[in-house]
């Protein structure tokens, strides 16, 4: 079974935290993102040491969807969670989400996801894992695996804000609008009517190192560390064999802690979560 618990076990077994080259382009920041995405896919598909041909087979077996564009998510585990891979520009700087707002869950009615994603398997809603990495040169120093329902609010919060902004733009007099999934698109802005304007949201979310600093701190003495945060209900939803295997791991650098996290939909209440950390020195 391919899931987050088994992926953490695999990382402990392999002790691997090196980034491969991934798909190389002319953009250095994009190259880092590609390498991180490859690492996360290899982690979940247990493919760190696989040949290219074997890796392709493992990917096909593990994932029902892998995206090559900018629409969310990056990956869907077959019969399991969705994965969205993001990189940290700094240990405490906001995480860039670009034009896609944060997700509590991934829903099939999200207008930003592709038809290929909607039709990859039978589903209506998926738990989503934000895999957020921080690297120094070619070495991954920190990887967060934080579930969206510990991190982001319900989709209605962001949708309502988007609708309010879009309607405000539409109320500007004497300009022409075109239907779009973005905040707005204005046409024919100049006397020749040849200039258009796309209005896009550029979303960010607070770095988990900052948001969850009450119970986790980055350990600069480590070569690598992974931090995973999920609700207790999510932890217990994994198959019994995965839970048994994970709880059978004996390693002095693996820590599993019960923590209370502010509810993203109601900060006055808390949710019971599992915090899993593993460090390589």
Regions found by a protein language model. Name each.
Residues 1-72, 87-281:
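Nucleic-acid endonuclease domains
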């Amino acid at each position: 079974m391919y899931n987050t618990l088994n992926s953490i076990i695999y990382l402990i077994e392999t002790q691997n935290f090196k980034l491969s080259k991934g798909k190389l382009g002319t953009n250095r920041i994009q190259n880092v993102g590609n390498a991180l995405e490859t690492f996360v896919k290899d982690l979940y598909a247990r493919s760190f040491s696989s040949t290219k041909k074997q890796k392709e087979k493992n990917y096909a077996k593990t994932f029902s969807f892998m995206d090559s564009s900018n629409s969310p998510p990056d990956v869907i585990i077959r019969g399991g969670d969705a994965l969205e891979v993001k990189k940290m520009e700094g240990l405490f700087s906001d995480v860039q989400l670009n034009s896609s707002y944060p997700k509590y869950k991934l829903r099939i009615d999200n207008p930003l996801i592709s038809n290929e994603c909607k039709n990859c398997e039978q589903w209506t809603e998926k738990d989503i894992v934000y895999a957020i990495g921080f690297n120094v040169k070619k070495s991954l120093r920190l990887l967060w695996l934080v579930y969206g329902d510990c991190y982001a609010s319900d989709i209605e919060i962001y949708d309502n804000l988007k609708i309010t902004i879009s309607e405000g733009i539409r109320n500007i007099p004497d300009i022409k609008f075109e239907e779009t999934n973005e905040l707005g698109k204005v046409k024919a802005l100049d006397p020749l009517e040849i200039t258009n304007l796309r209005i896009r949201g550029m979303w960010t979310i607070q770095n988990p190192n900052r948001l969850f600093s009450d119970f986790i701190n980055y350990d600069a003495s480590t070569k690598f560390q992974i931090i995973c945060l999920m609700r207790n209900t999510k932890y217990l939803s994994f198959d019994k064999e995965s839970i048994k295997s994970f709880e059978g791991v004996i390693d002095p650098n693996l820590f599993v802690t019960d923590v209370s996290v502010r509810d993203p939909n109601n900060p006055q209440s808390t949710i019971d979560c599992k915090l899993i950390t593993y460090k390589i020195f």
